[in-house]
């Protein structure tokens, strides 16, 4: 889908003005109430009071979540006019704006419209600027239009069979191909940059969703490594992929312990984007890449285990984020690090009670092989010390306990530094990809005590997400660090099953803020 921005003079709406633009659909927002303003007022004048009459007669009240499609409206160049309800102006929040965008996309998806002049960006919430409105519009429109993995042969065959039998396949794309986002003339430059950034973020989210949604027999550790190579080649990043022998040479005993049960070779992926100059310390993103998690010898229940292909969504989001950063050309140095493997049971798999030595030299008693994410991450967190990072953020579908604590709304955020935590929280709010800060009190560390090693890899049922973060904290004392537990936000179950692309919006906004 192609997005662009266009600066319009709202005082010249009709005749040769923007309302005369030839397009398949003109999208206009209306607040609830009798008073028309902005684009709605201009449209009303150009159509000789049509909009006002619709409101007065109660045919369209502008209530949130509602819409009205008009066809062949006199005085308008568009084939259709879509009126979108914005609700009460006093209650027009970020979420209300997002709801309006989604309402418009749903309405357009039931038509054959291929192009739209989008006049909602000027009606962003008061505290938001045009850049926010444009980026949010693009990411939400692309998110709503996402369809799963059509390039893969197996899915193509299934789609062809469904089409032949008249069955819906869930991969039918809407007709919309071109969206022109209208902005005020004074916002032209900011809007143009925002369109580039919004497209990059949407591309990163789609990559993240694709990788997460792929079945684990396709998206193996090797597949992730090849994806990283492809990103590096397209965007001129530096790529280094370490195999088993190199991982062994680095003494990554914790990571290797997880890999033992699987026939799939582990990979350790490093991508470097150098946009900030040689002297700038990089921000390092570390993503958990368990491409399938059975739990190992501590086997998970069979029901719902298919969703454990999503246990690499941390890795997927890190790859999606660095791709977005490269597409945006941010003046920032960013490193993406992904330890990736499967967690499988076998005759040679790691057993509960085994003791291993991590890259840091600290020993770990593996009390539960299903607490494997922290084992691959701890060695990665030691490895990244060599970059002398400005900050390190690890991203992982780490604990079911985080879902119990926060549900599927907020990602769990852990950080020692208030400044880093606040920056991430603020970025999440702006990107509508929110997180909630969780505790890291030293008292929780007591739960990780072991009689046979420096620590156990679990701390019991109480505060399970917290103790997992406390485990990681032991390997991050040499730099500023934050941990995002995305177990509740990386994918959805049920009818809407699939990867969400989170926390790419949060991470990209955080990096844009640092680069500003």
Swiss-Prot record:
Recorded E.C. number(s)? 3.4.11.1, 3.4.11.10
Keyword Hydrolase tagged: yes
- In which residues is Mn(2+) 2 bound? 288, 293, 311, 372
**Pfam families, alphabetically?**
Peptidase_M17, Peptidase_M17_N
Key word Metal-binding present: yes
Record key words, sorted: Aminopeptidase, Cytoplasm, Hydrolase, Manganese, Metal-binding, Protease
Query: What's the chief localization of this chain?
Result: cytoplasm
Residues bound to Mn(2+) 1: 293, 370, 372
What cofactors does this protein use?
Answer: Mn(2+)
MF terms (GO), sorted A to Z? manganese ion binding; metalloaminopeptidase activity
Entry annotation: catalytic residues: 300, 374
Q: A Gene Ontology CC term for this entry?
A: cytoplasm
Describe the reaction catalysed, as an equation: Release of an N-terminal amino acid, Xaa-|-Yaa-, in which Xaa is preferably Leu, but may be other amino acids including Pro although not Arg or Lys, and Yaa may be Pro. Amino acid amides and methyl esters are also readily hydrolyzed, but rates on arylamides are exceedingly low; Release of an N-terminal amino acid, preferentially leucine, but not glutamic or aspartic acids
State where the protein is found.
Answer: Cytoplasm
Q: How is the cofactor bound?
A: Binds 2 manganese ions per subunit.
Listed under GO biological process in this entry are: proteolysis
The record's PROSITE patterns line, in alphabetical order, gives:
CYTOSOL_AP
Its biological purpose is as follows: Presumably involved in the processing and regular turnover of intracellular proteins. Catalyzes the removal of unsubstituted N-terminal amino acids from various peptides.
Family label: Belongs to the peptidase M17 family.
NCBIfam families per record: PRK00913.1-2, PRK00913.1-4, PRK00913.2-4
The molecule here is called Probable cytosol aminopeptidase
Tell me the organism: Cupriavidus taiwanensis (strain DSM 17343 / BCRC 17206 / CCUG 44338 / CIP 107171 / LMG 19424 / R1) (Ralstonia taiwanensis (strain LMG 19424))
Question: What gene is behind this protein?
Answer: pepA
């Amino acid at each position: 889908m192609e997005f662009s921005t266009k600066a319009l003079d709202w005082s010249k709406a009709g005749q040769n003005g923007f309302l005369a633009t030839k397009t398949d659909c003109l999208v206009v927002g209306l607040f609830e109430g009798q008073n028309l303003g902005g684009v709605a007022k201009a449209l009303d004048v150009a159509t000789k009071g049509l909009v006002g009459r619709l409101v007065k007669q109660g045919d369209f009240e502008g209530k949130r979540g509602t819409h009205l499609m008009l066809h062949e409206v006199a005085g308008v160049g568009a084939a259709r006019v879509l009126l979108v309800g914005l609700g009460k102006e006093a209650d027009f929040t970020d979420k209300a704006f997002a709801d309006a965008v989604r309402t418009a996309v749903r309405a357009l998806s039931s038509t054959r419209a291929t192009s739209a002049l989008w006049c909602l960006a000027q009606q962003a919430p008061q505290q938001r600027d045009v850049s926010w409105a444009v980026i949010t519009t693009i990411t939400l429109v692309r998110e709503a239009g996402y369809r799963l993995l059509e390039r893969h042969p197996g899915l193509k065959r299934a789609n062809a069979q469904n089409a032949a039998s008249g069955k819906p396949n869930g991969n039918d794309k809407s007709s919309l191909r071109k969206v022109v986002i209208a902005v005020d003339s004074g916002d032209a430059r900011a809007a143009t940059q925002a369109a580039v950034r919004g497209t990059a973020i949407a591309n990163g989210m789609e990559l993240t969703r694709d990788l997460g949604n792929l079945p684990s027999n396709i998206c193996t550790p090797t597949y992730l490594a090849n994806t990283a190579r492809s990103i590096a080649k397209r965007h001129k990043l530096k790529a280094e992929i370490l195999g088993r022998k190199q991982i062994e040479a680095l003494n990554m005993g914790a990571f290797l312990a997880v890999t033992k049960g699987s026939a799939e070779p582990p990979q350790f992926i490093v991508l470097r984007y150098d946009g900030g100059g040689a002297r700038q310390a990089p921000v390092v993103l570390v993503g958990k890449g368990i491409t399938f998690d059975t739990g190992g010898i501590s086997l998970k229940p069979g029901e719902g285990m298919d969703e454990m292909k999503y246990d690499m969504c941390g890795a997927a989001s890190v790859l999606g984020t660095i791709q977005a950063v490269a597409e945006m050309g941010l003046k920032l140095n960013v490193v993406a690090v992904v330890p990736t493997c499967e967690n499988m049971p076998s005759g040679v798999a790691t057993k509960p009670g085994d003791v291993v030595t991590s890259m840091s030299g600290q020993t770990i008693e593996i009390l539960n092989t299903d607490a494997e994410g922290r084992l691959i991450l701890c060695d990665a967190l030691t490895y990244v010390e060599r970059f002398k990072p400005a900050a390190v953020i690890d991203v992982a579908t780490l604990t079911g306990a985080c879902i119990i604590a926060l549900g599927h709304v907020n990602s769990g955020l852990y950080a020692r530094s208030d400044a880093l935590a606040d920056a991430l929280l603020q970025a999440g709010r702006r990107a509508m990809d929110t997180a909630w800060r969780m505790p890291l009190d030293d008292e929780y560390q007591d739960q990780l005590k072991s009689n046979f090693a420096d620590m156990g890899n679990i701390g019991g049922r109480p505060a399970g997400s917290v103790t997992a973060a406390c485990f990681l904290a032991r390997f991050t004392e040499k730099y500023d660090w934050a941990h995002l537990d995305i177990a509740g936000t990386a994918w959805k179950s049920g009818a809407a099953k699939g990867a969400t692309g989170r926390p790419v919006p949060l991470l990209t906004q955080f990096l844009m803020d640092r680069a500003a």
